[in-house]
Amino acid sequence: MKTDGGNTWRASHSKPLNTANTMGEPFSHSEYSVHADQSEFYLNELTEHSGQDNPCMNTSRLNTNRYGHPVVHPCPKIHCICTQSNIAAIGSDCTGCVDIAQACKMLRGGLGCTQDPCVKNPHTQCFTDVSNHAMRNVLPLNVSNTEQFPIQIEYANGRNPVLNPMDDLAMRAALLLSKDIDLQNTHILPSTRISIEKNIPVAAGLAGGSADAAAVLLGINSAWQTNYSRCDLLGKAGALGADVPFLIWGGAAYGSGTGSCVTFFETQTLYWVLCFSKHPLSTRKVFQELDRQRSGAGCNHHPVFSNPAECAEMLKKAIKRGPEALAALLHNDLTSAAKMLMPEIAERIKAAERCPGILRAIISGSGPTLALLAEDAEAANRACSILKDTGVICKAVSSPAYSSIYWQT
């Protein structure tokens, strides 16, 4: 992230656990920063949110920028900041949807903060260091003031994983906002070019494209000053895919319907190992195979999640009890379809669950990446080392990550 001059506002967004038969994948995380004076807009996509929690900061380092937003000057190692002012803003955006005090409590608990929630004082800070264990895509977005209004997507390595530009979720996210703007009644919007340096595996079940789409919605909303609320963007995100709304908010949550109905959970930090495959798996083909399997006999619905009304409450209780209780509920309806298309997944799951301290292994999203829930951080790191010795490409991560935003001058 460039910090030399200009007003900057920056946010990070991540997905919750995929503990039910939802269409979402866990662990993807996107963040953006906009340099208004320099007209440069950067997005980073991460696969996790991890690190040692830092104590709450006082308000002595805070003031406001020209837009009246809180300004902070964090340690260079701090990648994510959670402010009570942002939670208050979420509350005002979602009147009746979010209890501000409860949201503050949820954020504080996840970040290990011991300070009492402060709704009246919007400048109370909680910091968390996520400088370690990061895997990220970098997306510079260049904005220029011209009378043209093109939106260009290019890939830094010269290889676009999406053959049809209109299938690119980042492009679709940008176009989604541009369609709502009446250029006759507003200033001419700048031309926009996004260059994506892809580091997260494509077609891996990690929602990399969806994370980019969510960050583009939030980032362009700021860069173009379209002033949509977070709830407005939540509704728009659902049009891009059922998993994109997760990334607008972050945290741990249960999504139902088309993904726009989200129930948030308070949760302790959970430790995982992501095991990657050398070969991609098409989401479209996995769902086609699932449809084929469900059209005949032997439809494999998980009984625990057959009643959506009870699912959120069951997950909430399990998460509070700890990883062992949560492991008993982990299930992915796409598993049988993914195994049919890539039979080696079955053996990979068995090998992973033989590692000491691994409670459960499931496929992430539509696969083929596996998500291994560990007892604790030590077990996750130990399993990661064991699997690496057998040639498995893997990474120890933690969850959940929280949606946050800050401004810096």
From Swiss-Prot:
An annotated Gene Ontology molecular function: ATP binding
Pathway membership, UniProt: Isoprenoid biosynthesis; isopentenyl diphosphate biosynthesis via DXP pathway; isopentenyl diphosphate from 1-deoxy-D-xylulose 5-phosphate: step 3/6
Catalyzed reactions: 4-CDP-2-C-methyl-D-erythritol + ATP = 4-CDP-2-C-methyl-D-erythritol 2-phosphate + ADP + H(+)
Domain of life assignment: Bacteria
Keywords linked to the UniProt accession: ATP-binding, Isoprene biosynthesis, Kinase, Nucleotide-binding, Transferase
Region (Disordered): 1-26
Amino acids binding ATP: 201-211
Polar residues: compositionally biased ranges: 1-22
Matches recorded under PANTHER family: 4-DIPHOSPHOCYTIDYL-2-C-METHYL-D-ERYTHRITOL KINASE, CHLOROPLASTIC
Function: Catalyzes the phosphorylation of the position 2 hydroxy group of 4-diphosphocytidyl-2C-methyl-D-erythritol.
Similarity-based family: Belongs to the GHMP kinase family. IspE subfamily.
Name of this protein: 4-diphosphocytidyl-2-C-methyl-D-erythritol kinase
Organism classification: Bacteria, Bacillati, Actinomycetota, Actinomycetes, Micrococcales
